[in-house]
Design a protein with these regions (language model features):
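Histidine/acidic-residue-rich, glycine-tolerant segments that coordinate divalent metal ions
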Residues: 1-76, 81-87, 170, 195
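Metal-dependent peptidase/peptidase-like ectodomains
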Residues: 11-32, 37, 41-44, 102-155
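Solvent-exposed residues in well-ordered beta-strands and their adjoining turns
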Residues: 29-31, 77-78, 97-99, 131, ...
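Divalent metal-coordination and catalytic microenvironments
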Residues: 34, 48, 94, 147, ...
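His/Asp/Glu-rich mid-to-C-terminal helical/loop segments that flank catalytic regions of hydrolases
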Residues: 47, 57, 61, 109-113, ...
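Active-site-adjacent substrate-binding region
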Residues: 53-60, 129, 135-188
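A conserved active-site cap/scaffold subdomain adjacent to cofactor or substrate pockets
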Residues: 83-108
Length: 229
């Protein structure tokens, strides 16, 4: 159920529907020194800032976004304990989202290369580790085509919408890897609400209208009955 889709509507997509999610950590190591004498050390804070900017150019300048969307987000920066000490080490944590396995592999390689070379240019080092969390949530095209009439019976033709791919991720992707599957969205947003003003998932003000689950129940029942015919 989706907080930014109106009650009574169903959204689906054939093929890659939700992104693969990977977490990364970059450990930037420099040389600690006093903040008044930066030339005596190697500043991992400045190097980390340069790496963050460099990672964004992987998406904006090195990735063919007309094929598929991709995201690199640095969301955590840890380093330093005092205002007048340049620390020895800074850690960057973030997430990578991709809708294509080839693009995923290339972006992983470029993150490692970008971080290490930027660090090297300043005399620092950057060690990158990437943890693959979920796969691309892939809807089997043949199954999806077969099940669209089931959605129409549940919600009406005007309320069944072919959606764009989503850069959020789902562990349902592991089921879809094993058997032909379909993952879809049912509306949980009150009618008349502007989707841009509806609070997204994973935020403090997230809210859904549970009456939207009626459409979901109808859809699931139709899917089961129609699939077994």
């Amino acid at each position: 159920i989706n907080s930014q889709t109106e009650i009574g509507k169903i959204k689906y997509r054939s093929g890659g529907t939700m992104a693969a999610s990977d977490w990364f950590k970059i450990k930037v190591k420099g040389k600690q020194t006093h903040g008044s004498q930066p030339w005596e050390g190697i500043d991992p804070v400045v190097v980390s800032a340069q790496i963050i900017n460099g990672l964004q150019s992987i998406i904006s300048r090195q990735t063919e976004l007309t094929k598929n969307a991709a995201v690199i987000t640095v969301s955590v920066i840890n380093g330093g304990v005092r205002s007048n000490i340049i620390p020895e080490e800074v850690s960057l944590l973030g997430t990578i989202r991709t809708l294509d396995t080839g693009m995923q592999r290339t972006i992983h390689e470029k993150i490692k290369l970008t971080a290490s070379k930027i660090a090297e240019a300043s005399g620092a080092t950057a060690e990158t580790s990437i943890d693959k969390k979920t796969l691309v949530t892939y809807n089997n095209p043949e199954l999806t085509k077969k099940m669209i009439p089931s959605f129409v019976k549940a919600a009406g033709a005007d309320n069944v919408i072919e959606a764009e791919a989503v850069t959020g991720a789902e562990d349902f992707s592991f089921f879809a890897e094993k058997v032909p599957s379909i993952f879809f969205f049912i509306g949980g947003m009150e009618k008349g609400t502007d989707p841009k003003k509806a609070f997204p998932h994973h935020t403090p003000d997230f809210r859904i209208d549970e009456s939207g689950m009626k459409t979901g129940i109808k859809a699931f029942c139709n899917l089961v009955f129609d699939y077994t015919k």
